[in-house]
Amino acid sequence: MKKILYSVALAACCMGTMTSCSDFLDASNKSNVTDKQTFATKEGFNSLVNDAYQHLQNVYAAPLFTSCFSAGTDMYADARNKMNEALNTYETLTPENTDIKNLYTYLYAGIRAANSVSYYAQTAQVDDKTKGQLVGEARVLAAYEYYLLVNNFGGVPIMKDFLTTADTGYPKSSAEDVYAYIISELKDVIGKNVLQASTATKGGGRISQETAKAILAKTYLSAAWDLNKQDYFSKAAALADEVIAGRRLTTPFAKLWKADGSGDDNEEFLWDVEYDLATANNTTSGGTEWSSYYCNYLGGNEDNIKATTSSYVPTLYALHCFKKGDQRYDATFMKELPDINKGNAANTGYWTWYKNGESLVGKPVTRYYSAWYETDADFEAWKAIDPANRANTYRIPMDSQSKEAQNMDGRDMEYYDNQQLVYGSSPCKKFDDSQTASNQKNTCYRDIHIITLPEMYLVAAEAYLKAGDNPKALARLNEVHQRAGLPALTGTITIDDILDENACENFGNEARWMDLRRTQTLVTRCTKYNHEMGDKAAQYIGKKLLRPIPQAAIDANDQLTLADQNPGY
């Protein structure tokens, strides 16, 4: 069979959210209407734009996010289930890895969908202002997908236009050329000023001017590291400050991440993959698995639990990043569990905490997961709040020395050994959906936040630090740090300080692997904090500082050869 890159992209498109590619792009579809006729209408053109956005779900609304962006870092560990072992320990990572192939394929499918908007805009019966805005949004979408590609794979083929005929392939462009293309596209769209100023409080699902600037800031930051362009750090800092626009972080962290979704449209969430239970076509299994991430096993479907992936639990490093007084800890982790077995006398379950007003006061508490910094006195003070229901609560410290969690038999147990048991660690509640309160997967209808205002403060902090301006770096970092209820940091900061802050602010929702790759700390941090690798991190990772170009992509592209593969594979 002839090798064509087009066929790979088209196949990926068919796996997306459209009914099928042929229904929309084939001139001989059921209605006998050509693609140009279909997409010339306002409704048809808008369907193209919506489809371009929906391709993001393949990356962010699926387990692909955790395996590609959370595994193999300093923050997450195996539990009863192992995460993707090849991506977590690198030793067996090859170009045949399914998750990496899917990431690559989905991103190019998204680019193709975005490019189709510009192509069909030429004949679309839409007013010029709307057309300019929608084409601008699509161009930024494609630029963002290239940003993800270059940060994971380095140099990749660049497809600037929508393919209407089969093509035998595209050559691999250098990382420098990919960055240059992203920057050029973003600067051009921003300069045209065709986008909405902000969409954060309008749902946050559409690209805006501040979104485009945020992506450009992140692009300059990555390119500065990867291409050794010192002036790009200053550009990244200036753009991040433009996005910040003098805004302070004033909303309490717990309110932002409230499980009922009431914080999802806060101005701090600049860009989202949007979900909405009220308008969902499928309200029982049409959501995402986000509420089940970063949690150990809690029981079977017969129990009053929430579904969990039983993997990606916090490492001891991640837990210790949270200092005493950090308000983000209690908003990130569920510390109290009642009896959640089916038919228990109190008729309680995992979701009782929400149904009882975000508290278990008045309900018997079976397990209490104390933070690493909590003392015996702190535990006794907590029990004294509701002594009748907490007298017999079993305490499981979230520290290196813990207590056996499953049978509550009081045995001392190492933290990582405990993760092989039921109830081994404090469940992550940051992404809970209390509106569905389900024990099934795919029932989270909360928005997925791709870019946030706190992230822009951290981008600015990193960029100013690398540009040699410690006072400004410290000020940007402290805006995030102090919002969490912590005293201001002083003195000279390091990249480790920023990564530690990021771990607390963005536990679970940040592409941690990309952060460590970008900052050239992947090996050192995995050596210190990745329980599965430890001292073998340098050996296992070796030259694998980028993801492998999928073998299927090389086979399907006449202009790629094995010489284009990334080092280490």
In which residue ranges do the predicted regions lie?
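Bacterial Sec-dependent N-terminal signal peptides
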Residues: K3-I4, M15-E43, I182, A217, ...
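Long, intrinsically disordered, low-complexity segments
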Residues: C21-F24, A79-R80, T94, L107-Y108, ...
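An aromatic- and glycine-enriched ligand-binding surface/loop that stacks and positions planar moieties
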Residues: S22-R80, K187, E210-K213, K218-Y394
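Conserved, well-structured interaction surfaces
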Residues: A40-V59, N81-F153, G169, S173-A180, ...
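Short coil/turn linking the two alpha-helices of tandem helical-hairpin repeats
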Residues: L148-P157, S222-K229, G468
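C-terminal substrate/ligand-recognition segments
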Residues: T348-N478
